[in-house]
Structures are given as C-alpha cells and as structure tokens.
Swiss-Prot record:
Residues 1-37 are annotated as: Disordered. This is Uncharacterized protein UM12046. Belongs to the dynein light chain Tctex-type family. InterPro entries: Tctex-1-like, Tctex-1-like_sf. Pfam families: Tctex-1 (PF03645). It comes from the Eukaryota.
Length: 143
C-alpha cells in the first residue's frame, strides 16, 4: 500500500435538540494547592444531568480492522481523484455506521478520512483542535 491513511472520529456528548439553538457557556474557576499550582474546578449543579462519554475504545479496534481491510490491496493513483474520493467516503461511512451502532443517540459524529501519497515520509495523525470538554477523539494511521 503506497497511500497512508488516517482516520479520526470525534463524538461530542452534548446533543442539540431539533428546533433549539445551541448555546455554550464557559465556566472557569481555579483553586490553588499549597505548592502554588492551580487546577480547574468544575461547577456543581443539580440541574445538569451528568454527561455520558462515547466509548472510543470500542471504535479503535474497528478503525484498525476497517483500514487494514479497505487499504490492504489499494494503490495510490494521483490522476484518479474520483477513486480516491470514493474510497475515503466509503471508509468514513463504515466508521460512522459503527459509531452509530456503539452509541445511537445523544451524540453528533464527525468522521474524517484522509488518503495521502506516501513519498517515503512517516505518517502521523495531527491533533484535533475540535475536541473540547465533553468530547472524545480517536484515530488510527495505516501505512
């Protein structure tokens, strides 16, 4: 396989109800310990239900096997952009279906699949800047 691929999935745990605008609030408080270090303290309210987190560990094995199965015999053809785009989309669809199988309600999913030509360089999965509190991110690089 001459095209490394990386796939990342982000699952925010705060759903937006249909017909409602999404609002965000930022809470910050800090407390100092005797050593002078500060740490964030989350506000505690009884009105807010506890957030559930997406279980990314269930998805990680699926990412590895899906990328291996789909890319094992694939080859990079720079001139065939439609083939590369179709392969990326098909991988993303399979991963998103698995995410919906793991946790069908209460999450919005973002799946990104990137196929790039391997010119002898190493592969890496860049950090995802979209992940915030209450979200999780998982990824896999296949070479």
């Amino acid at each position: 396989m001459s095209a490394p691929a990386s796939s990342s999935a982000i699952a925010p745990s705060q759903p937006t109800a249909p017909g409602h605008a999404r609002h965000s609030a930022s809470w910050s408080a800090s407390a100092s310990d005797p050593s002078g270090a500060t740490c964030a303290v989350a506000p505690c309210t009884s009105l807010t239900p506890p957030r559930t987190r997406f279980d990314a560990s269930q998805l990680q094995a699926h990412l590895s096997s899906t990328l291996a199965a789909r890319l094992r015999n694939a080859s990079w053809d720079k001139s065939d952009k439609d083939k590369n785009r179709a392969l990326s989309r098909s991988i993303a669809e399979v991963i998103k279906l698995k995410m919906l199988e793991i946790e069908p309600k209460g999450f919005k999913f973002i799946v990104q699949v990137q196929l790039v030509e391997n010119l002898g360089q190493g592969g890496s999965r860049p950090g995802v800047s979209l992940a915030r509190h209450g979200q999780c991110c998982t990824g896999h690089v296949f070479e």
